[in-house]
Amino acid sequence: MKRLLSIALAASMMLIGTSAFAQVSVGAGYINETNKVKIGDSSNSMGALNGFYAGFGYDINEGEGFGISTGLYYSFLTGNVSVPSLSVLSGDMTEHALNIPVKAGFSVPVGSGLSGFVNVGPTFVCGLSSTIKPLGVDLLKTDLYKHEYLSRFDIKLGANIGAVVNNMFRISVGYDYGCLDQFGAGIKGKNDDGSTKDRGYSLNRSRIVVGLALLF
């Protein structure tokens, strides 16, 4: 997964370096992330995390309304979560991450100074920090990455729709679904060869994102 993230970052840099017509943006917005836990045949919500993202984007116009969007964004999420059968994942959770989207899009004029767009593709996520505090007590705070309860990496597939106003402001709303199981060996255990066991546990994370960007 680290190699895949490196490839995504390298691809983003190549796109930035080879574009004949491109537009830089800075943006921020709101994130609502839901956590779906599957244990055996049962499936439940672990709870929602809310927060924000901020960063810069790079939009490459390929002509005829088609383009590619990439960038680098920091995200912060926090909320109260609970998995009754997994006490280590119950409490106040806080996460910091970097996000690299690589999405293909299409835009069309819909009025004077106004255009609509849609884009689809993956966002590569690298977690910087993930901690949980049972009962909200700082002394009981646990590093979820250090203990391998959760994975740092995810690939979220999703789509965004929105509008660009006067080629200066972009408003968007999107949905991303996390394709990779986020439970680590600290939850599932390890086999003799060091690989993570398959115990029928899985955690997939999806999110709704609403954002505003300033275009340059």
PLM segments and residue spans:
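Outer-membrane beta-barrel strand-turn architecture
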Residues: A20, I60-E64, V108-S112, V165-N167, ...
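Short glycine/proline- and aromatic-enriched beta-strand/turn motifs that initiate or cap beta-hairpins
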Residues: A20-I60, G127-S129, L135-L140, R207, ...
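Residues that define the transmembrane beta-barrel architecture of outer-membrane proteins
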Residues: A22, M46-F52, T94-I100, S151-L157, ...
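Repeated loop/turn-to-beta-strand initiation elements of outer-membrane beta-barrel proteins
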Residues: V24, E64-I68, L114, N167-V173
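Glycine- and aromatic-enriched membrane insertion/assembly motifs of diderm outer-membrane
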Residues: S25-G27, S43-S90, T94
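Transmembrane beta-strands of outer-membrane beta-barrel pores
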Residues: Y30-K36, I60, Y74-T78, H96, ...
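Extracellular loop and loop/strand-boundary signature of outer-membrane beta-barrel proteins
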Residues: K38-S45, S85-D92, K141-H147, D193-G200
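Predominantly the C-terminal beta-signal and adjacent terminal strand-loop region
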Residues: Y73-V81, Y145-F216
